[in-house]
Swiss-Prot record:
Binding residues for GTP: 28-35, 94-98, 148-151
Organism of derivation: Thermococcus gammatolerans (strain DSM 15229 / JCM 11827 / EJ3)
InterPro entries registered for this protein in UniProt: EFG_II, EFG_III/V, EFG_V-like, EFTu-like_2, G_TR_CS, P-loop_NTPase, Ribosomal_Su5_D2-typ_SF, Ribsml_uS5_D2-typ_fold_subgr
Keywords noted in UniProt: Cytoplasm, Elongation factor, GTP-binding, Nucleotide-binding, Protein biosynthesis
Main subcellular location: cytoplasm
Subcellular location field: Cytoplasm
Family note: Belongs to the TRAFAC class translation factor GTPase superfamily. Classic translation factor GTPase family. EF-G/EF-2 subfamily.
Name of the featured protein: Elongation factor 2
CDD domains reported in the protein's UniProt record: aeEF2_snRNP_like_IV, EF2, EF2_II, EF2_snRNP_III, Elongation_Factor_C
């Protein structure tokens, strides 16, 4: 095992030299080659065998588990790369595989300082490339560009060198346009990617070769040589002349920042505490002697060790046996094992210093996004997931004895993919799986079958709707069952600007730590500052304000009122679907002095009924989720595809031609999109490539709303007739 020990010794030595560390990720549109690139980088750095890496995608799904273990489960892989005679430690963090991470600040982006953006040379910059790039730049992650699948330009599209260079120039211009739009002010110009300085590389991850201008200058290999070797089919020659991992990892070392550089500008942006405090200064300097602070970015279930939490160490040193605080969970824990990932295996270490990615056990119940420190400090900005699951299926194990295995599998899927919501009901054995669309759920169900060998019954897919209001309600009185407590509230629709600010994370979900600051932001967005100061809670895109003056005992029941507000928002009055874009204001209250008469059994019904009654007086409406569909098709199928979209209440947003291919971008309600895959394959003889992403919610047309409310109520075992104001509001 000489080589392995040598590698571990090298990693241990480099861990203490932050200027030699690079924490990076790979981000791409689906199918642009992220996995192949990461596997081949690992193979090149000697972490998995080269044979495996090439074949990994050729093997089919089941046998792939060992081969694939690395891309499915490894949260982070450390490798050593020699650049100009010096060794560097490169931590590659696996960004979640599925592209349905819509707007979430993917946990991985928090832990890395730089990212390789992968773009398919044939398809160019796609909508999801924009999503991941925006994500990275929002977290102050510096990008470099890898243009992949260049072999297809040479062999399939038979383009000459000049046409290929034109294609590259367009992709680079498109990427730089996005960098200019989304990068932080101070980095807009210096983070642009350029061919001449080597912050752009191009090649084929599948065939394991790559080129960049610095590499061509250094070795004398020219693009013409590559074209000749590709046309000859000399794959070995390609790999030897222009090895992928050398070119790409050289680019990483040269252009992506080390933790010492990156933390100077990232900490003030990501952390809300006082930068001049000891901890603040230690994090700015990435000081291994400071107080230990780490942020958990991913949780993996290890068969032997239980839950392993991986995360970034911002300051201090993580040590075995250390007593730590989990800041968000408000509890203590003791770190048991400390280690790092080398390839797919976890290597135990005594300690891991600042600037590294660590894997620890012992942090029971920690969620991704948790701040862990040796003392109570301000937590890092919450990781907010703005993607909203819009389709649900119910799953049951066909065989009762598979139940524990199914629960385990669902929990694991949910931990790997934050956009998947799993509701486990151990009593009925019926579990709900909610995802971003039919396709997203199909992929997950396929994995239950192939990887977990589970036989399950799946219900037809159900769309998740939302309820909202269209105008301000009059003041409504809510009385507790014992008549001793009265609350006077109104509801009103939330302005789009405020809703967007919540989705973007500018206004954080939850009870605000600093209400004045949130009120200031709300005032900037057009709300009266005096009213905005009453902000109590932000919940799933809804808000609760206390606009009362000097009410006795109100503080004692505020927690109960917030819980009641949550209940009212989880199930709206029309069809018990979640509520969105509603502002609830408390204007006045009369509260019994004796706390026996103002417990949960009195307060919950009072506030919940009042909110629902106010909603019924405020023009209640149903919203439905929409999907954006991006379809690539040969020109002659244009008509068939637009017909298919029109039949589904969809509309065309944009069309553009790239060579022989038409790219159509449309939007349609998720409810109409079931079976779209089969229909589109049929209409285009299987020649369409397509992806979808979440496109927010829109109002259901009035003529359909009543019918849909009926269907939902029937499915939930409620009286199918849509409720009226009389049904919801208590008779005085």
């Amino acid at each position: 095992m000489g080589r392995r020990e040598e590698m571990i010794a090298k990693i241990k030595e480099l861990m203490t030299q932050p200027e030699r560390i690079r924490n990076m990720g790979i981000a791409a549109h689906i199918d642009h080659g992220k996995t192949t690139l990461s596997d081949n980088l690992l193979a090149g750095a000697g972490m998995i065998s080269e044979e495996l890496a090439g074949k990994q995608l050729v093997l089919d799904f089941d046998e792939q588990e060992q081969a694939r273990g690395i891309t499915i489960n490894a949260a982070n892989v450390s490798m050593v790369h020699n650049y100009e005679g010096q060794d560097y430690l490169i931590n590659l963090i696996d960004t979640p595989g599925h592209v349905d991470f819509g707007g979430d600040v993917t946990r991985a982006m928090r832990a890395i300082d730089g990212a390789i953006i992968v773009v398919d040379a044939v398809e160019g910059v796609m909508p999801q490339t924009e999503t991941v790039l925006r994500q990275a730049l929002r977290e102050y992650v510096k990008p470099v560009l890898f243009i992949n699948k260049v072999d297809r330009l040479i062999k399939e599209l038979k383009l000459g060198p000049n046409e290929i260079l034109q294609r590259f120039a367009k992709i680079i211009t498109d990427v730089n346009r996005l960098i200019k739009r989304y990068a932080p002010e101070e980095f807009k110009s210096q983070w642009m990617v350029k061919v001449e300085d080597g912050s752009v590389a191009f090649g084929s991850a599948y065939y394991n070769w790559a080129l960049s201008v610095p590499f061509m200058k250094k070795t004398g290999v020219s693009f013409k040589d590559i074209v000749e070797l590709t046309n000859k089919g000399d794959l070995k020659g390609l790999r030897q002349k222009a090895p992928l991992h050398v070119v790409v990892l050289d680019m990483v070392v040269r252009h992506l920042p080390n933790p010492l550089e990156a933390q100077k500008y990232r900490i003030p942006h990501l952390w809300r505490g006082d930068i001049n405090s000891d901890v603040g200064q230690a994090m700015l300097k990435c000081d291994p002697k400071g107080k230990m602070v780490m942020v958990v970015t991913k949780i993996i279930l290890d068969k032997h060790a239980g839950e392993v939490a991986t995360g970034r160490v911002w300051s201090g040193t993580v040590k075995t046996g250390q007593e730590v605080y989990l800041i968000n969970s408000k509890r203590k824990a003791r770190i048991q094992q400390v280690g790092i990932y080398m390839g797919p295996e976890r290597i135990n270490m005594e300690a891991v210093p600042a600037g590294n990615i660590v894997a620890v056990t012992g942090l029971r119940d920690a969620m991704a996004g948790e701040t862990v420190s040796v003392e109570k400090i301000e937590p890092f900005e919450a990781l907010h997931y703005t993607s909203e699951p819009v389709v649900t299926v119910a799953i049951e194990a066909k065989n009762v004895k598979d139940l524990p295995k199914l629960i385990e599998a669902l929990r694991q899927l949910a931990k790997e993919d934050p956009t998947l919501h799993v509701k486990i009901d151990e009593e009925t054995g019926q579990h709900l799986l909610s995802g971003m669309g039919e396709l997203h759920l199909e992929v997950k169900l396929y994995r239950l079958k192939t990887e977990w060998k589970l036989d399950v019954d799946v219900s037809p897919p159900i769309v998740v709707y939302r309820e909202s209001v269209t105008k301000k309600s009059p003041i409504v009185e809510g009385k507790s069952p014992n008549k001793h407590n009265r609350f006077y509230i109104t509801v009103e629709p939330m302005p789009d600007e405020i809703y967007e600010a919540i989705r973007e994370g500018i206004i954080p979900e939850g009870r605000p730590k600093n209400p004045k600051e949130v009120a200031k932001k709300l005032a900037e967005l057009g709300m009266d500052y005096e009213l905005a100061k009453g902000i109590v809670d932000v919940y799933n895109g809804n808000m609760f304000f206390d606009n009362t003056k000097g009410i006795q005992y109100l503080n004692e029941v505020m927690d109960l009122l917030v819980d009641g507000f949550h209940m009212a928002m989880d199930e709206g009055p029309l069809a018990k679907e979640p509520v969105m874009k509603v502002i609830v204001r408390l204007h006045d209250a009369k509260i019994h002095e004796d706390n026996v008469h103002r417990g949960p059994a009195q307060i919950y019904p009072a506030i919940r009924t009042a909110i629902h009654c106010a909603m019924m007086k405020a023009g209640p409406v149903l919203y439905e989720p929409y999907q954006k569909v991006i379809i690539n098709i040969p020109y002659e199928y244009m008509g068939a595809v637009s017909r298919e979209l029109n039949q589904r209440r969809g509309q065309l947003i944009d069309m553009r031609q790239e060579g022989e291919v038409m790219i159509i971008i449309g939007e349609a309600p998720v409810a109409e999109m079931f079976g779209f895959a089969g229909a589109i394959r049929g209409a285009t003889s299987g020649k369409a490539l397509w992806t979808t992403e979440h496109a927010g919610f829109k109002r259901v047309p009035n003529e359909l709303a009543q019918q849909i409310i009926r269907q939902i109520r029937q499915r939930k075992g409620l009286d199918p007739n849509p409720p009226t104001e009389k049904d919801v509001c208590p008779q005085q």
